[in-house]
Structures are given as C-alpha cells and as structure tokens.
Amino acid sequence: MMKVLVVVALLPTLISYSSSEGIDDLEADELLSLMANEQTRKECIPKHHECTSNKHGCCRGNFFKYKCQCTTVVTQDGEQTERCFCGTPPHHKAAELVVGFGKKIFG
C-alpha cells in the first residue's frame, strides 16, 4: 500500500515536470517570433518619415498600419517631384477617435 501511495504522489510531479519542459520550448519559440517581429519593426518606416522609395514599408500605428501618402511638390526651378510620407489617413483617424472615446466611456 505504501508503494502505491508513493507512486500516486510522484505521478503528478512527473506530469507537471514534463509539461513544464513543453512550456519552456513554447516560450522559446514565442521569444524567437517576438525577436523576428522586432527586427521587422525596426525595418519599417515610422510615422511622418519619407516613404517615397518604399511605399509599402510604413509601420503599424495603434490600430492600423500607416499609409504612404504622396503629394506633388513644385520646386523653385519649376520642376515637379513626388514626395511621400507615412501617415494616418483621415478615416483611420476618425476610427481611432471613436475607439478612444468608447474606451473612455466604457472603461
């Protein structure tokens, strides 16, 4: 009877130990994934920075990815060039305003 009690007592310990190794492996995979996401985040173009050469490389904002917005600039010499920057489109600003207002009301 004593041997059965010892085995029953050790069984949950062994199960928790084996599952914790699986969790450690999962955490290591998540850490590698987060490091890869951080690397991509460093490569993206921040808000208000020029994106003329890479129009799809803008970073993510709070809720939406910034969009590359372009304008035509006329220099003093009279030549036209296109200049682009990463920014938040007006409809995204409105959505962020509504969500922020909703968070203040509903907590």
Swiss-Prot record:
Pfam families in UniProt: Toxin_35
Tagged with keyword Disulfide bond: yes
Predominant subcellular localization, coarse grouping: secreted
A cellular component term, taken from the record's GO annotations: extracellular region
First and last residue of the signal peptide: 1-20
Entry keyword set: Disulfide bond, Knottin, Secreted, Signal, Toxin
Protein name: U1-lycotoxin-Ls1b
